């Protein structure tokens, strides 16, 4: 689009040499140059990058099994957490999920956790422009962390902070809590550096297997012995702690441990 060049205008001196001295030359008239339109007016508002664009979401618990968000979904907010994947024993855990759902079906409507992992952070919120820098900080913090082979042991019942959901989980064997805490500490420091909430204190490392809506802690504790019998049929539940993952929305970063 070509911009119009608004020049100033003035009256010229008389070109007629015969003009008498009694005729006065008109005073110069200065016109102000009109202000050019701003770029936003011509080009429209700045468009977000494709990665930043997230449609406004109206949270409807009916669309995801009655779950409620712990924080409001807003454009530019990326739900973020750090975890260790439970890939080494995923087949055994999925078999337990199927058997437990069938066993408790008359009492509760249980849902399986689809991404089986051991959390090393709370779910926090990052802005899009923070993600890469946060990932680099986390990678640097974990550079000296050593991996190890661990196991899961038994079952335990948890609720979320709002007590709107109840979980059946397999805790980390107590023999490996100290080593897992050594990995957690630099992660907590990164969270602190970014003014984000640190992990629970005291930490309770576990892999969530099943969940249901509402506070069903009492009922599930009554069924815990029965559920443990299902898990006892499984071989040792191994957990390979050789890498840590960062999940930011649909982005996943992996950091190998020594």
Swiss-Prot record:
GO BP, sorted A to Z: U6 snRNA 3'-end processing
Pfam families: HVSL (PF09749)
Compartments in which it is found: Nucleus
Region listing for Disordered, in residue ranges: 1-20
GO MF, one annotated term: 3'-5'-RNA exonuclease activity
Entry's EC annotation: 4.6.1.-
Principal location: nucleus
Active site as annotated: 117, 206
Keywords, ordered alphabetically: Hydrolase, Lyase, Nuclease, Nucleus
Residues that coordinate or bind AMP: 117-119, 200, 202-208
GO (cellular component) term, any one: nucleus
Binding site for UMP: 200, 204-208
Reactions it catalyzes: a 3'-end uridylyl-uridine-RNA = a 3'-end 2',3'-cyclophospho-uridine-RNA + uridine
Function: 3'-5' RNA exonuclease that trims the 3' end of oligo(U) tracts of the pre-U6 small nuclear RNA (snRNA) molecule, leading to the formation of a mature U6 snRNA 3' end-terminated with a 2',3'-cyclic phosphate. Participates in the U6 snRNA 3' end processing that prevents U6 snRNA degradation.
Family membership: Belongs to the 2H phosphoesterase superfamily. USB1 family.
Name listed for the protein in its UniProt record: U6 snRNA phosphodiesterase 1
Organism: Drosophila melanogaster (Fruit fly)
């Amino acid at each position: 689009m070509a911009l119009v060049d608004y020049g100033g205008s003035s009256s010229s001196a008389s070109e007629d040499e015969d003009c008498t001295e009694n005729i006065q030359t008109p005073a110069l008239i200065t016109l102000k140059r009109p202000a050019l339109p701003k770029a936003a007016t011509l080009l429209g508002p700045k468009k977000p990058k494709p990665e930043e664009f997230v449609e406004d979401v109206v949270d409807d618990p009916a669309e995801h099994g009655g779950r409620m968000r712990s924080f409001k979904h807003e454009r530019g907010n990326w739900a973020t957490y750090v975890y260790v994947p439970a890939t080494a024993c995923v087949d055994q855990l999925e078999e337990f999920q199927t058997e437990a759902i069938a066993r408790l079906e008359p009492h509760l409507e249980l849902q399986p956790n689809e991404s089986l992992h051991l959390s090393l952070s709370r779910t926090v919120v990052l802005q899009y422009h923070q993600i890469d820098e946060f990932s680099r900080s986390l990678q640097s913090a974990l550079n000296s962390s050593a991996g190890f082979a661990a196991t899961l042991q038994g079952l335990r019942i948890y609720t979320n902070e709002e007590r709107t959901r109840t979980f059946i989980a397999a805790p980390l064997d107590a023999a490996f809590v100290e080593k897992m805490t050594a990995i957690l500490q630099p992660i907590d420091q990164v969270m602190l550096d970014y003014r984000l909430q640190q992990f629970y204190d005291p930490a309770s490392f576990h892999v969530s297997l099943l969940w249901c809506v509402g506070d069903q802690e009492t009922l599930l504790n009554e069924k815990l012995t029965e559920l443990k019998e299902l898990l006892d049929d499984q071989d040792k539940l191994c957990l390979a702690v050789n890498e840590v993952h960062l999940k930011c929305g649909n982005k996943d970063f992996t950091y190998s441990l020594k």
